[in-house]
Amino acid sequence: MAAQCCCRKAPGAEAAPARPPPEPPPALDVASASSAQLFRLRHLQLGLELRPEARELAGCLVLELCALRPAPRALVLDAHPALRLHSVSFRRASAVSESPCTFAFPAPGSGPPLPGFADAPGAESASCPLAFRLDPFTDYGSSLTVTLPPEVQAHQPFQVILRYTSTDAPAIWWLDPELTYGNAKPFVFTQGHSVCNRSFFPCFDTPAVKCTYSAVVKAPLGVQVLMSATQSVYVEEEGLYHFHMEHPVPAYLVALVAGDLKPADIGPRSRVWAEPCLLPTATSKLSGAVEQWLSAAERLYGPYMWGRYDIVFLPPSFPIVAMENPCLTFIISSILESDEFLVIDVIHEVAHSWFGNAVTNATWEEMWLSEGLATYAQRRITTETYGAAFTCLETAFRLDALHRQMRLLGEDSPVSKLQVKLEPGVNPSHLMNLFTYEKGYCFVYYLSQLCGGPQRFDDFLRAYVEKYKFTSVVAQDLLDSFLSFFPELKEQSVDCRAGLEFERWLNATGPPLAEPDLSQGSSLTRPVEALFQLWTAEPLEQAAASASAIDISKWRTFQTALFLDRLLDGSPLPQEVVMSLSKCYSSLLDSMNAEIRIRWLQIVVRNDYYPDLHRVRRFLESQMSRMYTIPLYEDLCTGALKSFALEVFYQTQGRLHPNLRRTIQQILSQGLGPSAEPSTEPSTDLGGAEADTNPDSPALLLGDEAPSSTISLRDVNVSA
């Protein structure tokens, strides 16, 4: 269904219909070079051809636009040096036609797909070429300025057609068959968050702008194509995939994946897609569960709006854990090893269907509006499904990591604010850190306590989603809606309570001003603290004997991970402690999932415990995932094991994605001192051998304020 411009009139009408009230322009986004505030984007249409052998995507993009002001001289889009623009043209849209663009594909290799139009009688069908230029903007993109013809008038629909090819684009990840599990077919996926999709197609690359989209995709025979769309059809006789997203989404949520993917239904509105060898595991771990989580979310926050909720498992090269692309969550296949991490990650992406996808932060300076609310909703869903104790354990684990990051960055770091102020040139993707999630969660949790508990707050969030669905908001929209929904709180001036002012929550650096009381999870967290205290007690022999009697194999994954994180925080440990830990746990931990193994191996590396380095080597030889390789290489290069890191890298680099390989090379080069030269010679000496039980009213633990400042480029050069 093609979106219509507000100025279209019915055939035969004597006069133009009354113009609707003007829509507010999008929020200003310093991460976008575009002129989004001057135009209304109604719909975008993509014609794409995937060329894996050349690692090239050929595209034709049609933007359906209305100018918001008279006689605009130019249209400015976000683009990228990876885009090669072949032509840009203009076409006046028909006032009566509702037919979207159709795409005719030429013979393979003869050029990008060509647009064709279903013309209405009497409509101007001819397009005219437009002048354009690409200019530098930041290190993550360019600006594309298109000169518009003088006849463009305010509120009159028109189309801009762009033909381009994209190679070596940050948004498009091409994998040779050797980098997949099946080693059979090439694989490609896109990752648009936060500002990468400007290298996928020219766009208004800001979360403030949403539109519907459609796409037609041509791919090599036998390659399955999926997109983040509400409708998809494969026309076998054409060899083309057709997609349509009927709800407005920001550019970063337009996503594509193609490869040797097979489906399996796991519920009435869900299926998993994965490489054939992974499909049985993915199906067994999620069958029935996703519908349970969706139903819980609907009880809390209203109907699921996106039709289907499918999940595609991507190869280990996927640069993040998961991405909430509407209708089609992308998730890294490595997470299948860990049941509990898989559960939490998928539920978090489910929560984004309401918070982030339906209601979106208007700028990247307020990412907490999506991530903080999604984290809160995720924990409400897990509480409904698995109980408060499990939710408190997972929250304790994450808040523990938040405070660890706080110690790393310092309490005055501007990236610890919820409402950040970006200087031009800062890549918003670098600001994805635990403050966005966990400090945002703590503020949302605080709001829920102000109104009397989670049930009343659920009612508010349901109304908030209904009011703002398919739009983008700023923090003030959320807070104004909150105080309007609870007028008694507005009368009490809860937004100005000393030390807990809303403005202070948003703009103060440092830890959260208040944190939830997690005592309902004490039955799960107390054993962790007790075991950690045993291992740090004196005398070691007696402590080790007592500790070894505790069977952690029966623990939840988050308990074991929290225990190992405590040991990591205490590193470097005495060598005799590490030796006893290894004797007690190393074989057991070897049999556990990667989330556990990497933590134990970081303890090994940070304590220079050579007898277990063979486990580090084996782990890095088997892992191709960014989230499991980067932390170990960083630790290896920080300590005394740089030559060991080099040796392992030289032996495994051929199995790594080029982007990951470059990142590790940077770590290795930074980790080498002036006297240390890279060597391919093997290093033979290193590689061998009880509490409040009311879930509705937990107390709040207050924190302190820290000064605030502006985020600049130097502030994001810290590993988050």
Curated annotation (Swiss-Prot):
It comes from the Eukaryota. Keywords: Aminopeptidase, Hydrolase, Metal-binding, Metalloprotease, Protease, Zinc. Coiled coil: none annotated. Its EC number is 3.4.11.-, 3.4.11.18. The keyword Hydrolase applies. The keyword Transcription regulation does not apply. Its cofactor is Zn(2+). Zn(2+) binds at residues 348, 352, 371. The record marks 437 as: Transition state stabilizer. GO terms for molecular function: initiator methionyl aminopeptidase activity; metalloaminopeptidase activity; zinc ion binding. Substrate binds at residues 321-325. One of its GO terms (biological process) is proteolysis. InterPro entries: Aminopeptidase_N-like_N, Aminopeptidase_N-like_N_sf, ARM-type_fold, LTA4H_cat, M1_LTA-4_hydro/amino_C_sf, M1_LTA4H, Peptidase_M1, Peptidase_M1_C. Signal peptide: none annotated. Pfam families: Leuk-A4-hydro_C, Peptidase_M1, Peptidase_M1_N. SUPFAM superfamilies: ARM repeat (SSF48371), Leukotriene A4 hydrolase N-terminal domain (SSF63737), Metalloproteases ('zincins'), catalytic domain (SSF55486). Binds 1 zinc ion per subunit. The active site is at 349 (proton acceptor). It catalyses: Release of N-terminal amino acids, preferentially methionine, from peptides and arylamides. SMART domains: Leuk-A4-hydro_C. Belongs to the peptidase M1 family. Broad specificity aminopeptidase which preferentially hydrolyzes an N-terminal methionine, citrulline or glutamine. This is Aminopeptidase RNPEPL1. It comes from Mus musculus. The lineage of its organism: Eukaryota, Metazoa, Chordata, Craniata, Vertebrata. The gene is Rnpepl1.
